[in-house]
Amino acid sequence: MRPALSDYRHLASGKVRELYRIDDEHLLFVATDRISAYDHILSSEIPDKGRILTAMSVFFFDLIDAPNHLAGPPDDPRIPEEVLGRALVVRQLEMLPVECVARGYLTGSGLIDYRKTGTLCGLTLPPGLTEASKFAEPLYTPASKAELGLHDENIDFAATVDLVGEKRAAQLRERTLQIYTQGADHALTKGIIIADTKFEFGVDPSGELVLADEVFTPDSSRYWYADAYREGQVQPSYDKQFVRNWLTGPESGWDRAADQPPPPLPAEIVDATRSRYIEAYERISGLSFAEWIGASA
């Protein structure tokens, strides 16, 4: 008989995830259908989103050549029925206070910083770059982890050294770029550009660096259509940039600068977001989402 969710002690809530303790060494990592944008948790949810994020992470954890935090399969008997398909049993780690961002292309906050200073996280970039310019080599551009509701801040490598020490900072940079390259190369064979992504790492009791949280999901990554890529233009995407674009467009009526909660998403935006997430999973994995645990039709 599977345990009930109430059998586990709730430890923490994030923008999208809930964390529960199973025992002294294992946690239950639950992905909800919540969606966040611009440091707000939206009132609207995206049906099946938690399952899509979980399915995508499981696929990439299996693909990537790096130790990860999984401690059981997605149908592990320790996972309660009510969260089956959107929860994972993971190892408890000492999490590191760095968002490890890898960028293959210039966009988002990186483009904003570049336009202001010509640099990104302490790295001097060549002149003449524009929206969606591809870097000669992927860049490691870390950020500090912010409290819930606050914004992560881009930092340079020296600041990472201050946070975790020189040896661990160098290891984070190397591992981040290795994982990004492997995942982005795979996605490109499926017609998808992973423009950038973020990883989180922890350390196990032996001191080994372990990939944790989520990996290459549409929440943590920018997914672009490879056949539609055009430098100098905002790219059509599979990820939650679609939601951000609606929120900052005239139809939403939302004034981001006023620091008011975003409005509910219209049904068509909810449906289109769900469809984009599913399409990203199916194209990248080659699997049918309908066959994932508990997926709705």
Curated annotation (Swiss-Prot):
Pathway: Purine metabolism; IMP biosynthesis via de novo pathway; 5-amino-1-(5-phospho-D-ribosyl)imidazole-4-carboxamide from 5-amino-1-(5-phospho-D-ribosyl)imidazole-4-carboxylate: step 1/2. It holds the Pfam family SAICAR_synt. Gene3D superfamilies: ATP-grasp fold, B domain (3.30.470.20), Phosphorylase Kinase, domain 1 (3.30.200.20). Its EC number is 6.3.2.6. Coiled coil: none annotated. One of its GO terms (cellular component) is cytoplasm. Keywords: ATP-binding, Ligase, Nucleotide-binding, Purine biosynthesis. It catalyses: 5-amino-1-(5-phospho-D-ribosyl)imidazole-4-carboxylate + L-aspartate + ATP = (2S)-2-[5-amino-1-(5-phospho-beta-D-ribosyl)imidazole-4-carboxamido]succinate + ADP + phosphate + 2 H(+). GO terms for biological process: 'de novo' IMP biosynthetic process. InterPro entries: SAICAR_synt/ADE2_N, SAICAR_synth, SAICAR_synthetase_CS. GO terms for molecular function: ATP binding; phosphoribosylaminoimidazolesuccinocarboxamide synthase activity. It comes from the Bacteria. Belongs to the SAICAR synthetase family. This is Phosphoribosylaminoimidazole-succinocarboxamide synthase. The lineage of its organism: Bacteria, Bacillati, Actinomycetota, Actinomycetes, Mycobacteriales. The gene is purC.
